[in-house]
Structure formats: structure tokens, C-alpha cells
UniProtKB/Swiss-Prot annotation:
The gene is Styxl2. This is Serine/threonine/tyrosine-interacting-like protein 2. Keywords: Cytoplasm, Phosphoprotein. It comes from Mus musculus (Mouse). The modification Phosphothreonine is found at residue 427. Residues 773-788, 936-947 have a biased composition (Low complexity). Residues 386-409, 552-567, 595-614, 965-977, 1035-1059, 1074-1091 have a biased composition (Basic and acidic residues). It is found in: Cytoplasm, Myofibril, Sarcomere. Residues 376-385, 858-871, 1107-1116 have a biased composition (Acidic residues). PANTHER family: AGAP008228-PA, SERINE_THREONINE_TYROSINE-INTERACTING-LIKE PROTEIN 2.
Length: 1138
């Protein structure tokens, strides 16, 4: 292999053998025959086919090999002078210069920026990359990179409906098949991101696709490319340039504000060419429009010269113009040919300028020139239009002054003329009158008509002509117009008054709005001419609406309306100078005057607007007071149930739950619902919040302060009651009953409800009044309702109380109420089984079994009975208090009965009090061996049903009382509890009328019931009786009450069974007589005896300390009860068959 020697040494051309060696070296260094650490596919097992990056050492070796071993380039013999050749540096500089020159080439007919300027604007001193993968660069147009275009989930979230792929097949390899199932329309543009690529061929197609996408319902289009900075951005910019008439820089910056884009030089150059093309097209369109306008101005110039020539012959000019105008008045004025429009506009301008003869002659020369030039060409037409505009600009101020003077002069002439000429001046049929009458008045009239109609047409023309670019001048002119119209108004209204009596059907009074605009017609026309290229059609429309918004109403009302209506309006409006009207009233008057339907009386009424407002205020105040009075009367009627309670409904209102039901706790410590529904014994004891006395007369006014004070009192009492209930809820039930009991011990029958309220209010000390509990009772009444008083007979119960504060009843929880009602019904059902067992025991009380056991069990039962009595009382009462119906539990009903008994017989109440005190002192002794005197009517009621039940059922006690003793009980209780029937029925009446009537049993039954009840240790917030002293004796915590589902019929039946079936010495015959009276209700009770008897038996056996032999007695009782049950069922079946 040849090696290189000195620089001057002659190089030897290698032979073929050496050349092969060189190639071998090249293959070694320039190709990697096997994978190497530099190979792109170094992990591949196959031989690399790629050119590898050459390592530095390999590069040095290769260079040395090439320099030494390969044949050098032969020296060319230069035919040219070496100085004439360009060096590489020169070539590079030239190439750079050419590129920069292309980028800086800003040669353009439309000042299109060069590519370099566009790039500088896009980079903004630094080149940025897009921050987001996708950006919304135009409403519903998104530019995104490749990752977004292939993410179907993201496309769905974006709501994309169209996709324009600017790199279809050249970077973003998607297609319409890729988006199947997404309901996406796809368009792919196959373009590489190189400057030499021609993307302009896709501009139109892509722009049309984008436009179609945005026109679809909820259309959103995604334009994607590899990076979303060049190809996709160029297509969006082309769309903005084509369909939104944006210049190239504006379109690029619109996109750049939303996303960093950087199209390559070639794309920018093609966008620049597109901009030039679009600008050229738009210029051609504008040129066509201008040529059309020039043709119109040529026609206008022709008409101008003709009109000036006709001015010499005033009669022919006036008649012709008035004929033309009269015919045009009846036409629709919005659509007019170009020739007619130009003619009218110029005539309007001429009339507004009021040229003198010299000016007319001077104009005639110029316009005759323009007439001849119209045949030759369009040279003089532009000059004519410009001259018209310049004349208007130079004379606008002078014209305004002249217009005012001309107005005044015409007014004076009109006033001087006769009535007939005045009338003709306002008619629409001047075309016929102009030929027959050629007076000066007619000429003036025709000029005015022309001016008015032309001004109106000039207004219509303003829709198609451009208007001024600012609003200020028009606002000033409007103010001046209004002032002039106001000045004209009074003299015109006087004239119309004179003409009013003789008005004709065809007559027409020109309205002040018309007159106010007459002088402005030429001004408006010239504004249109001067500024026609400065405003958009929308702005022109706004100008028209502001300046001439009444044009249609004017033409319709003015043409069709007679003088009579307008004169009437004027006569009515005569009053308006002295009237201070609101903006709305002024507008209404103007509107009525336009349509010719003004109402004098309405105007006069408007002048009395202040009185009307006062009357409305007074009426509103009266309505408010009447509403308040009705509300208060309803509240009073709620509180005055005594007057008509016999006819009142016996059902408990749902609103009665509202005040206390939500506050009842799970263990039923409070009887707030019972207190809510508590039936007051005497309405006089109800110190409810007094209602304000209100006069009834419709003209009267009531003091709002009194109503507010009353409402404040109501709220305060309600809040106090709620606080008391919360306090009571936090105490155990035994404490509540213990506190309630002593307070109730010494109270009379009328104060029993106050005991209940005392317990509810947390044992508040009774204030010193005639009755110590009257104020507590008022607290109760404030939360609850005014309760009804029972009438003399047992069946008549005045209806349930209706809460006076029903406005606080919005918080009723119906679900909670339903749940509590179900619990109460379950309690009643289980209670029924207990009652049936008690009945069974009473039926068999004369048996030797009971007699044998009674003496021994009395002592054992005394303590247990009290406990169980307390439990039963609280359990029964808990549920009855929770739900609105006061369930006829024995204890509650007995206490109620005694309260009624006291209410109706005060002496017996006093006797009861003394008996209770005596009984309290020696309760245990009495319970161990109750003497017969203790069983007198007042003290007999101390045994609760539950105690009797346990005596008879749980302990299998055979009663020691003889028949005479039981009869004694009955008779004595007849004496003491004459009202018991009433009480019992009254208690049950809180639930239903039927229950109330069912509770009328024989007095003996009731005496037993109430006597047994009197002993019940109910918590005193439950009892309405004075005997709650039992609660003192049974402070043990009450056992959880039994939940017993039962129907409302069960409630009634239970109330019946409560009173009929349990007594210290109850005879089954008595209860059976009552069951015969009640029929099917008794049947239901008997049916349920079997259902719950065994469960209740075991429960009561467990609750008392019994001896083993009692179990045998229980079995005997059960056998006897089953036998009794069978007999009862057979009897009931017999009765049913009968």
C-alpha cells in the first residue's frame, strides 16, 4: 500500500490490488459488519444495514485513508481566470443573501408583511414551544399534536366532530377507519413539513372543511399534525383568511395568541401569496360595487339637471313632483329602484338647501354639463357628487338657520290663510287639487308634502346607504329637533283646536314628529353620501332606529288618521303643559298620539298620577290589614273552641304534632305531644297569649305594632317551651315523674293539666295566682293547643284542640310520626293481650283458686305491682304521647277520668284530694291489706289496670273481696266518679269519636276502671289526675315500654277494654254486657287475646317475685282462660250469625 511521503512528493496512483485493500479498510471503518456498541440496532442479532455513526478514531483513520490511498481529484486546467471564480465563502454569503432577501421581500400591492416580519411577530423575541398538547385557537377549532389525534377518549371528551389531519401519512398515521364508531368526519392532507412543499393547493379544501364543520350542530374540529405548530397552524390561518376576511398578520396573531406556532419559511411565503390573491379578489369586488354606485350617481346627475331645468316652470315642477309623490305615498317605501331613490334623495337635498335663483342657474350650467357628460362618460358624475357633498358641508350651519326661518315663515302663512286652504294643505289628494288651484298656498303646501314624503324616503334609503360613523352629531341634532318640535307644538295645537270641529275624513294633520324631522332630510342624505363606506349595515340600522324609529307608525297613522282624532288628542294634551308626567307616561302619550288613539280621560288620569299611587298604596295596605285580620280571627277561633266545640271535629289535627313531636326522645321522658293535644278542662284556665283586639270594619286600620307584639309573644313562649322540653329530655323519666308528682298532690281537678305542664316545663315553680299552675298551664298552652272542655254527658266531647300557632308547624316529620304511630299501635296490641289476661283473671276471680291465693299474694304483689304499674303507665303513655292519639291506656285514661270527674264535681275532687293524701301516707299498709273504706269511690281508683292485671294474672291472685265488697266499690264509685264515663270517653275522644262513644259503659265498670287507674304511678306529665302521687312511690326506673302495633280500631277497642275489663273486682258480666253493646270491636279484642296472652303471661311472671306454687296457679289460669276464650268465641260467632 502506498504511503504518503512529503508534501512535495508525487502521489502514486494505487494499482488494482492496492485499491482492493483500500476498499477492505473502508469496509472495516465505514460499515459495521456486525452489531457494535455504536450500532442503532446493537441489540439485534442480524447484521446491521444502517450507516453507523463513525467513531472519532475511525473518522481520523478514514480521513487519512481517503487522503492517502484514494486517487485525488485531477487538477482541472482552468480556462478562466482564477480571480473570476467564486470562493466557497462567497457562495455561502450569496446563498444566505438570497434566502434573507426572499424572507425580507415585502414587495406587495397590499402591504403584505414579509416573511421575516411575520416570523418576528410569531416568535416575539423568543421561540416557544406549545405549552399544551391541544389548544382552542378559534371558537370550536382546536390545534393539537399527534398524541391527541390518536387518543379516542380525549377526542370524545372534547366533543370533536371533525378531524383535519395535516400530516396524513407523513407523521400522524390515522384515517377515517381509525375513528369508526366515534361519529367523526375525517379529512387527511398529505403534506411534509418542508419549505419546498406546496401546501397552498390544500388551502381551499381545508378551509371549506373547517367551515362546514363549524356550521354543523355542536361542531368541533381538531386540526392535527406532528407537533401542531406548522402544518396545522397554516391550514387554520388559511381558513381565517379565506372565510373571515382576515389579513395574514391578523390571522397569524389570532392563532398565536392561543398557541405558540412557527410555520416554516416556505409555508409563510405561500400564505403571503394567498393573502395577495385574496386582497386582489376583494379589490375587484369593491371595484364592481363602486362602478354600480357610479352608475347610480350618473343617474342622479341626470335627474339633477332635469329637475333644475324644470325649476323655471314652477307650476309644472310642482304638479309633477306632487303627482309623483302622491302616487309614491301609497307605495311601500322601503323597496325603491335606484333611479327613483337617487331622484328623491337629490330632490330632498335641493328642497332642504332652498337654493335661490342665481344658485339654481349656476347649478343648471354645471348640471347641463353633467347631463351632456352623462352621455359621454362618467367624468363629471364624481365631480357632481363631490360638489353636492361639499355644498352641504359648507352650508350645513347656514341651512339649519334657514330651515328655522322657513319654518316660521310657513307657520305664519298657514295661520294667515283661510280655513279651506289650511285644510287642503293637510290633505293627501293634492295631485288633483294642484291643477285646479294654483295659489301660493297650494305651492307651499306641495313643497311641504314633498319634503315630508321625501324625508321619509330618505330615511328608508338610509338602510341601504352608509351613515355617519359617530353618534354625537346625530344626538346633537336630535336635541335640536326636539326643541324645535316643542316650540312648534303649542301654536300647532291651537290651530288644530280651531280645525277640530270641521275636520274631514280624508284630512291629515302632519304630526310633530314629522315636522321635527323635515329639516333633517337633506342633512341625513348628505351624511349618508359622505360616510357611506364607514359604517356597517348594523350601525346604519341602529342610526335609522334611533333617528327614525317611528317611520312605519308615522306613515300608517298619518295617512289613515283623520284630523278629528289628532285634534282630540291635542285638546287632551292641552292639559299636559301643566302636568308633570313620568317618562313612561310621556312615552305613552306620544305613542297614543302616533296611532291616533289618544284618550283624554287617560291623560287626565295621568295628571293625577300621584293620587292614583296613593290610592294603590292605600288599597294594598287595606288588603294587608284584612289578611292579617283574617289570620288573627282564625287564630282566635282556634282558641275559642268552647263556643262551638260540640260541632268541632274530633280528630287530632296533624299540626298538633308540630310543636312537640320532634323533641320526644326515644325513652319517652316527655309527654309533649300529649300536652300538645291536651284537652283543657276549663278554657278559663288557659292564659294563652292574648290575641290583639282588631276592629272589623273594612275602612279601619289596625296597629301593625300590636300584631308584631303578639307574634313576638308567641315566639318567646314557644322558645321557652322548647327549652323546657330539652331540659326535660335530659332527665331520666323517674326524675321527671318524681318532680311532677309532688307538685300535683295538692292540686284541684282543674289544676291537673297544669301538673302536666309543670312536668313538661321542667317543674317550673307555679306563680302565685288563684291557681298555682295557671301560668305553667299557659306555657303548656303556648306550645300546645287550646283544648276542648267535655260536656255534661259522657258521649259529648268538645273537639280536639287546634294549635293556635300553626305557623310554627312547618317542621312536621311525617316519617317520624308514622314510625311513632306504628310503635304505639304495637304497644296497644301487646297491651291488649295484657288486658285480656286481666279480664280472664277478673272472670275467674270468684274461683277457689283465686281466693286461696289472694291473702298470701297481696303482700308480695304490692311492691311489684307498683313497679309494673309505673312501667305500664309510662310505656303506654310514652307512645300515646308520641303520636297524636292519646291511647286509652288505663292509667292515662283513669287520670283523665278523675280529672273530668273533678272538673264536673268539685266537691268530689276535694274528697279525692284528702283521700289521696291519706292514701299516700299509708300506701304500703293499704296495699298489704286494703280496707273497705280505702276502696271508697275516691281511693278505689288508686289501683292501675296493670296492678289489677298483675294481681289476677301474674300472681294468680284470688281476690279477697266479696261480692258485697265489689258491689260496694261499684256503688261508691258511682258516687265518686259520676263523671268517669265522661272522662274515659273524653280521653279516648282525643283519638276518635268512635272510641269516645264506646267508652260509655256501665258506671260500675267505669268506677272500677278509674279506681284501678287512680293508683297508677304514671309520670305526671302523663296524668291529668291529681293522684300522680303514685309516681312518688315508684321512683324505680321504668322498664322499656313494649312496642305494640295496633290499628286505630285497636285503639278504640283498647280504650273500651281499658275501662270495661279491668277493675279491682270486675265482673265479667259487666264487661260482657259492654262487649255486647260494642259488637265487632269486642270481637276483635277477643281474637287478639289468644295472640298475645302467653307472651304477656311469661313477661309478668318474670317481673314479680312469685313462689313455685304460682306456676301451677298460672297453668290453671291459662286453662280457665282458654276455656273462657272458647266460650267467648262461640258467643261472638253466634252473635255474628244473628
Amino acid at each position: 500500500m502506498a504511503t504518503g511521503g512529503d508534501a512535495e512528493e508525487e502521489q502514486v496512483v494505487p494499482n488494482e490490488e492496492d485499491e482492493a485493500d483500500v476498499r477492505a479498510v473502508q469496509a472495516r471503518y465505514l460499515r459495521s459488519p456486525s452489531p457494535s456498541q455504536y450500532s442503532v440496532v446493537s441489540e439485534a442479532e442480524t447484521e446491521s444495514i444502517f450507516m453507523e455513526p463513525i467513531h472519532l478514531s475511525s473518522a481520523v483513520a478514514a480521513k487519512q485513508i481517503i487522503n492517502e490511498e484514494l486517487k485525488p481529484r485531477g487538477l482541472r486546467t482552468d480556462t478562466e481566470c482564477p480571480g473570476m471564480l467564486e470562493s466557497a465563502e462567497q457562495l455561502l454569503v450569496e446563498d444566505l443573501y438570497n434566502r434573507v432577501r426572499e424572507k425580507m421581500d415585502d414587495r406587495s400591492l397590499f402591504n403584505t408583511p414579509c416573511v421575516l416580519d411575520l416570523q418576528r411577530a410569531l416568535t416575539q423575541d423568543r421561540q416557544e414551544a406549545p405549552r399544551n398538547e391541544v389548544d382552542e385557537v378559534w371558537p370550536n377549532v382546536f390545534i393539537a399534536e399527534k398524541s391527541v389525534a390518536v387518543n379516542k377518549g380525549r377526542l370524545k371528551r372534547l366533543g370533536i366532530t371533525h378531524i383535519l389531519n395535516a400530516a396524513h401519512g407523513t407523521g400522524v398515521y390515522t384515517g377515517s377507519e381509525f375513528y369508526t364508531g366515534l361519529e367523526i368526519q375525517y379529512l387527511g392532507v398529505e403534506v411534509d413539513d418542508f419549505p419546498e412543499v406546496d401546501i397552498s393547493q390544500h388551502f381551499r379544501k381545508a378551509a371549506e372543511f373547517l367551515d362546514e364543520a363549524l356550521l354543523t350542530y355542536r361542531g368541533k374540529v381538531l386540526v392535527s399534525s406532528e407537533m401542531g405548530i406548522s402544518r396545522s397552524a397554516v391550514l387554520v390561518v388559511a381558513y381565517l383568511m379565506i372565510f373571515h376576511s382576515m389579513a395574514i398578520l391578523e390571522a397569524l396573531m389570532t392563532v398565536r395568541r392561543k398557541r405558540a406556532i412557527y410555520p416554516n419559511d416556505g409555508f409563510l411565503k405561500q400564505l403571503r401569496e394567498l393573502n395577495e390573491k385574496l386582497m386582489e379578489e376583494r379589490e375587484e369586488e369593491d371595484g364592481e360595487e363602486e362602478s354600480e354606485e357610479d352608475a347610480g350617481s350618473m343617474l342622479g346627475a341626470r335627474v339633477n339637471s332635469l329637475m333644475v331645468e324644470e325649476e323655471d316652470d314652477a307650476t309644472s315642477h310642482l304638479s309633477g313632483s306632487s303627482l309623483g309623490k302622491a302616487s309614491q305615498v301609497s307605495k311601500p317605501v322601503t323597496l325603491i329602484d335606484d333611479e327613483e331613490e337617487e331622484k328623491k334623495l337629490y330632490e330632498e337635498w335641493r328642497k332642504g338647501q332652498g337654493f335661490p335663483k342665481g344658485e339654481a342657474a349656476q347649478g343648471r350650467k354645471g348640471r347641463s354639463c353633467s347631463m351632456s357628460s352623462a352621455q359621454d362618460g362618467d367624468d363629471c358624475e364624481d365631480e357632481d357628487v363631490e360638489r353636492i357633498i361639499q355644498e352641504w358641508q359648507s352650508r350645513n350651519e347656514r341651512y339649519q338657520a334657514k330651515g328655522r326661518e322657513q319654518w316660521n315663515r310657513e307657520e305664519e302663512e298657514e295661520e294667515e290663510n283661510s280655513y279651506s286652504s289650511r285644510r287642503r294643505r293637510h290633505t293627501l289628494s293634492e295631485s288633483s287639487a294642484s291643477e285646479s288651484v294654483s295659489s301660493h298656498d297650494i305651492r307651499i303646501l306641495k313643497q311641504q308634502l314633498e319634503r315630508s314624503t321625501q324625508s321619509r324616503r330618505g330615511r328608508y334609503r338610509s338602510d341601504s346607504e352608509s351613515s355617519e360613523s359617530t353618534w354625537d352629531m346625530w344626538n346633537e341634532r336630535l336635541v335640536e329637533i326636539e326643541k324645535e318640535a316643542a316650540r312648534k307644538y303649542r301654536s300647532k295645537s291651537k290651530r288644530e283646536e280651531l280645525d277640530g270641529d270641521c275636520s274631514e275624513a280624508g284630512g291629515r294633520v302632519r304630526e310633530d314628529d314629522e315636522e321635527s324631522v323635515l329639516s333633517e332630510a337633506s342633512s341625513f342624505y348628505n351624511f349618508c353620501s359622505r360616510n357611506k363606506d364607514k359604517l356597517t349595515p348594523l350601525e346604519r340600522w341602529k342610526i335609522k332606529r334611533i333617528q327614525f324609529g317611528f317611520h312605519k307608525k308615522d306613515s300608517e297613522a298619518g295617512d289613515g288618521g283623520s284630523e278629528h282624532g289628532t285634534e282630540e288628542a291635542a285638546a287632551g294634551e292641552k292639559n299636559l303643559s301643566d302636568v308633570n308626567l313620568t317618562a313612561y307616561q310621556a312615552w305613552k302619550l306620544k305613542h297614543q298620539k302616533k296611532v291616533g288613539s289618544e284618550n283624554k280621560e287617560e291623560v287626565v288620569e295621568m295628571s293625577k298620577g300621584e293620587d292614583t299611587v296613593l290610592a294603590k298604596k292605600r288599597q294594598r295596605r287595606l288588603e294587608l290589614l284584612e289578611r292579617s285580620r283574617q289570620t288573627l280571627e282564625e287564630s282566635q277561633s282556634m282558641g275559642s273552641w268552647e263556643a262551638d266545640s260540640s260541632t268541632a271535629s274530633r280528630s287530632i289535627p296533624l299540626s298538633a304534632f308540630s310543636s312537640a313531636a320532634p323533641s320526644v326522645s326515644a325513652d319517652g321522658d316527655t309527654a309533649s305531644v300529649l300536652s300538645t293535644q291536651s284537652h283543657r278542662s276549663h278554657a278559663s284556665n288557659m292564659p294563652a297569649t292574648p290575641l290583639p283586639n282588631l276592629p272589623v270594619g273594612p275602612g279601619d286600620t289596625i296597629s301593625i305594632a300590636s300584631i308584631q307584639n303578639w307574634i313576638a309573644n308567641v315566639v318567646n313562649e314557644t322558645l321557652a317551651q322548647k327549652q323546657n322540653e330539652m331540659l326535660l329530655l335530659s332527665r331520666p323519666p323517674s326524675v321527671a315523674s318524681m318532680k311532677a308528682a309532688p307538685a300535683a298532690c295538692g292540686l284541684g281537678g282543674d289544676d291537673q293539666l297544669s301538673v302536666l305542664s309543670t312536668s313538661l316545663s321542667g317543674c317550673l315553680p307555679p306563680p302565685s295566682q288563684g291557681r298555682p299552675s295557671s301560668d305553667v298551664q299557659s306555657v303548656l298552652s303556648s306550645t300546645s293547643s287550646l283544648t276542648s272542655r267535655a260536656e255534661g254527658s259522657g258521649n259529648k266531647v268538645r273537639g280536639t284542640s287546634k294549635p293556635i300557632y300553626s305557623l310554627f308547624a312547618d317542621n312536621v316529620d311525617l316519617k317520624e310520626l308514622g314510625r311513632k304511630e306504628k310503635e304505639m299501635q304495637m304497644e296497644l296490641q301487646e297491651k291488649m293481650s295484657e288486658y285480656k289476661m286481666e279480664k280472664l283473671a277478673s272472670d275467674n276471680k270468684r274461683s277457689s283458686l283465686f281466693k286461696k291465693k289472694k291473702a298470701k299474694d297481696d303482700e308480695d304483689m304490692s311492691v311489684g305491682d307498683r313497679d309494673e304499674d309505673t312501667d305500664s303507665a309510662i310505656g303506654s303513655f310514652r307512645y300515646s304521647s308520641r303520636s297524636n292519639s292519646q291511647k286509652p291506656e288505663t292509667d292515662a285514661s283513669s287520670s283523665l277520668a278523675i280529672s273530668d270527674h273533678y272538673r264536673n264535681g268539685r266537691s268530689m275532687g276535694n274528697e279525692m284530694d284528702s283521700n289521696i293524701n291519706t292514701w299516700l301516707s299509708g300506701l304500703r299498709m293499704e296495699e298489704k291489706s286494703p280496707p273497705q273504706s280505702d276502696w271508697s269511690g275516691s281511693s278505689r281508683g288508686r289501683y292501675t289496670r296493670s296492678s289489677l292485671l298483675r294481681e289476677t294474672e301474674s300472681k294468680s291472685c284470688s281476690y279477697k273481696f266479696s261480692k258485697s265488697r265489689s258491689q260496694e266499690q261499684d256503688t261508691s264509685f258511682h258516687e265518686a266518679n259520676g263523671d268517669t264515663v265522661r272522662n274515659t270517653s273524653r280521653f279516648s275522644s282525643s283519638t276518635t269519636k268512635e272510641a269516645r262513644e264506646m267508652h260509655k259503659f256501665s258506671r260500675s265498670t267505669f268506677s272500677e276502671t278509674s279506681s284501678s287507674r287512680e293508683e297508677s304511678p304514671e309520670p305526671y306529665f302523663f296524668r291529668r289526675t291529681p293522684e300522680p302521687s303514685d309516681g312518688e312511690e315508684s321512683p324505680e326506673p321504668r322498664r322499656p315500654n313494649w312496642t305494640r302495633p295496633r290499628d286505630w280500631e285497636d285503639v278504640e277497642e283498647s280504650s273500651k277494654s281499658d275501662f270495661a275489663e279491668f277493675g279491682a273486682k270486675r265482673k265479667f258480666t259487666q264487661s260482657f254486657m259492654r262487649s255486647e253493646e260494642e259488637g265487632e270491636k269486642e270481637r276483635t279484642e277477643n281474637r287478639e287475646e289468644g295472640r298475645f296472652a302467653s307472651g304477656r303471661q311469661s313477661q309478668y311472671r318474670r317481673s314479680t317475685n312469685q313462689q313455685e306454687e304460682e306456676e301451677m296457679d298460672d297453668e290453671a289460669i291459662i286453662a280457665a282462660w282458654r276455656k273462657r276464650q272458647e266460650e267467648t268465641r262461640t258467643k261472638l260467632q253466634r252473635r255474628r250469625e244473628d
